[in-house]
Design a protein with these regions (language model features):
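Extracellular beta-strand-rich recognition modules
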Residues: 274-286, 328, 337-346
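Short, surface-exposed beta-strand/strand-loop-strand elements in extracellular ectodomains
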Residues: 293-308
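Extended, charge-rich low-complexity regions and/or helical-solenoid scaffolds
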Residues: 460-635
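Short beta-strands within extracellular/lumenal beta-sheet-rich domains
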Residues: 246-271, 325-328
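Polar, S/T/G-rich
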Residues: 1-250, 349-367, 374-389, 399, ...
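Extracellular carbohydrate recognition and processing domains
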Residues: 309-331
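Surface-exposed loop/edge segments in extracytoplasmic proteins
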Residues: 11-13, 79-82, 306-317
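Extended, low-complexity, turn-rich repeat/linker tracts enriched in Gly/Pro/Ser/Thr and Asp/Glu
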Residues: 284-296, 348-351
């Protein structure tokens, strides 16, 4: 007995056979897909069915019932063949509604269609700020699982050098590296999907990142406070703590005084009102010693109650010089409630001091560019998923409300075995060749310039099948770009310092007035895929402001594991067991509703009469009739 529940209502249905098609990733088609669907069903236009469909067959009634999806449950003899499917009213012919339904596995692909990676909420996490202190923290972290990062590489902008066994990294144009594992988690969360699989738990997957060219950083500052001195200040020795700290007194809405207690009563440290990144700019209008002879060294900078900031000071050797308009900047992260002051002291001798005039202390809050449209290039999610599935040979199998991502090796070598020998009826069709492949199959990445593609050719590979029936060649390409073959090498440095070369920028040099001006032109939308790799090399991380920050290790972008030769060896090694002298069989089996209910495409079917194990691709099921099963022999 066939039962069809549409939006929870038992539909009137004639007990006629109809086909329910079940299929998974077609191993003869490199483009991954999965969907299970019914053929057209003719439902009588009874009062019950007309009510289910909102009387859509009455043109005078305003209704969108014909243009929406319906929840579908399909039972045979009380056994659920499909639960939570989605159905559509296709039309009406005579006294029958034409209805079709599908497994909700299609919803993932429908969800991905038309969506861009830039639309994912939470794509930019706390690690996504291009700040030297943030990048230093990332570099020293040993756990970046599901977090974005900044990876050291040669992006074509001359931002990296090696001197004396130390990387010098200018981060001005460094692109954001996006955790691919986190992207999948965000899709699952937003789409209310459940993704599972050993591959998704692997270190390989958690180490995988993507990054795009054509990014724009545009940090903005908002002025918080500008304070100035109004007198000459004798700078005291460093041991006099209370006399080396300078605070602020509000004169009016537009004016703050910089001085210290007790000379000026009421001065107080600046209290941070909102957590975030701040920049302090200090200008010393004039600095000189207070003695006609001797030498001294003055220090100036900031002090914070936040232990992660502490005191940040710069030295100024005075001697007999008078210094004018000395300017320095300090960047740091401050929490709400932190207190900030200015510090000035004399470091060397008690009897030689320093005098400063016209000091300006400016605090700005830095608002990072969180406009994802300028930080990340366009990338359709459907293309991203398709590329990832193709790179890793993944088949997503939907069962019991969950998507489990299986690699080809898992399906061929680890899937549970089911014995259908007793249900075998006959072979309906046997094919000995797969026209979806060729004698030579090229697995390719995109190239920066097709005419110079040989400069990136080492990332491509090929697979051969000995079958004279096949065409000579087919190309299978993914949407990611490969790096250059040759890595960036540094003079007087070992190969341990070599970096991947990715052309995110092109270098342009122009000679103007006898001087060479260098600019870097952004390339558009070049997505790359790579792994993060920890390299224990000292690194100085620099931006356009202040001194660099030193770290003892750094994360670098490594594409080695994404060479197609590596991918074919790791994820496609079992393809030969299917396609060397293939036997693609469509056979009839006497399957009942319990067989269909218990069946999983993550299975290997054993058929004694056919002499071995088979990987299932498609099943055409009709209640009360034999089922057609398309499968390929595992050699």
């Amino acid at each position: 007995m066939i039962e069809l529940y549409i939006n929870g209502v038992v539909a009137d249905i004639e007990q006629k056979q109809f086909t329910y098609n079940m299929q998974v990733n077609d191993m003869f088609d490199f483009d991954t897909r999965e969907v299970s669907y019914s053929d057209s069903i003719y439902l009588p236009a009874t009062a019950t069915n007309r009510n289910i469909f909102g009387f859509a067959d009455v043109p005078s009634i305003m209704s969108d019932s014909a243009y929406k999806g319906y929840s579908v449950d399909y039972y045979v003899n009380g056994i659920p063949i499909l639960q939570g499917g989605v159905g559509y009213l296709m039309g009406k012919r005579g006294d029958y509604f034409i209805f079709e339904f599908k497994d909700v596995s299609i919803l993932l692909y429908q969800y991905l269609q038309g969506r861009d990676i830039k639309g994912l909420k939470g794509l930019l996490d706390d690690n996504s700020r291009r700040d030297k202190r943030n990048i230093a923290n990332i570099s020293e972290s040993d756990n970046l699982d599901y977090k974005n990062a900044f990876m050291l590489a040669d992006y074509g902008d001359d931002s990296v050098n090696v001197l004396g066994g130390t990387y010098y990294w200018q981060i001005l144009r460094t692109p954001l590296s996006i955790s691919l594992a986190n992207v999948f988690n965000l899709v699952a969360s937003e789409g209310r999907f459940t993704f599972k699989g050993n591959f998704l738990r692997s270190e390989y997957w958690k180490n995988t990142y993507i990054s795009s060219s054509n990014i724009t950083y545009k940090d903005e500052e908002s002025l918080i406070l500008t304070a100035k001195t109004n007198r000459k200040i004798r700078v005291n020795h460093e041991n006099s703590y209370s006399n080396r700290v300078y605070d602020f007194l509000k004169i009016n809405d537009n004016e703050w005084l910089l001085d210290k207690y007790p000379e000026v009563s009421g001065t107080m440290p600046f209290v941070v009102k909102e957590s975030g990144y701040y920049r302090v700019s200090i200008t010393l209008g004039k600095v000189y010693r207070n003695s006609s002879s001797g030498e001294t060294s003055m220090r100036y900078g900031i002090g914070s109650t936040n232990s992660n900031v502490g005191e940040q000071l710069k030295n100024l050797n005075i001697y007999s010089n008078t210094w004018d308009n000395i300017t320095s900047s300090f960047e740091f992260y401050a929490n709400k409630g932190d207190m900030i002051s200015m510090i000035m002291d004399v470091k060397d001798y008690y009897y030689v001091g320093a005098v400063v005039e016209n000091v300006t202390f400016k605090i700005e809050k830095i608002k990072s560019n969180d406009d994802i449209n300028t930080l990340v290039s366009d990338l359709q999610l459907i293309d991203l998923f398709r590329n990832v599935f193709n790179i890793f040979g993944i088949t997503p199998i939907y069962e019991r409300g969950e998507y489990t991502f299986y690699t080809l090796s898992e399906r061929v070598e680890e899937a549970p075995m089911i014995d259908w020998s007793g249900k075998f009826v006959k072979i309906k069709e046997l094919k000995f060749h797969s026209s979806e492949y060729a004698k030579k199959n090229n697995f390719l990445y995109k190239k920066y310039d097709d005419e110079r593609g040989y400069l990136q050719s080492e990332w491509d590979s090929r697979m051969f099948f000995s079958d004279e029936v096949l065409v000579d060649r087919k190309d299978f390409s993914v949407g990611f770009y490969s790096p250059f073959n040759e890595r960036r090498k540094f003079e007087n440095s070992s190969s341990d310092f070599d970096l991947e070369r990715m052309e995110f920028f092109s270098k342009e040099e122009k000679i103007e007035n006898g001087f060479t001006n260098t600019s870097y032109k952004e390339k558009t939308g070049r997505w790359h895929i790579f792994s993060k790799e920890k390299r224990n090399k000292p690194t100085i991380i620099r931006d356009t402001v202040g001194n660099g920050i030193g770290v003892s290790s750094v994360w670098v972008a490594s594409s080695e594991r994404f060479k197609w030769s590596e991918l074919l060896r790791n994820y496609y090694k079992t393809l030969h067991r299917l396609l060397d002298r293939p036997k693609i069989i469509t056979a009839e089996f006497a399957l009942n509703e319990i067989d269909i209910y218990e069946f999983s495409f993550f299975s290997r079917i054993y058929v004694e009469q056919l002499g071995g194990y088979f990987l299932p691709n498609k099943i055409k099921y009709k209640a009360g009739a034999v089922a057609e099963v398309e499968m390929i022999k595992i050699n």
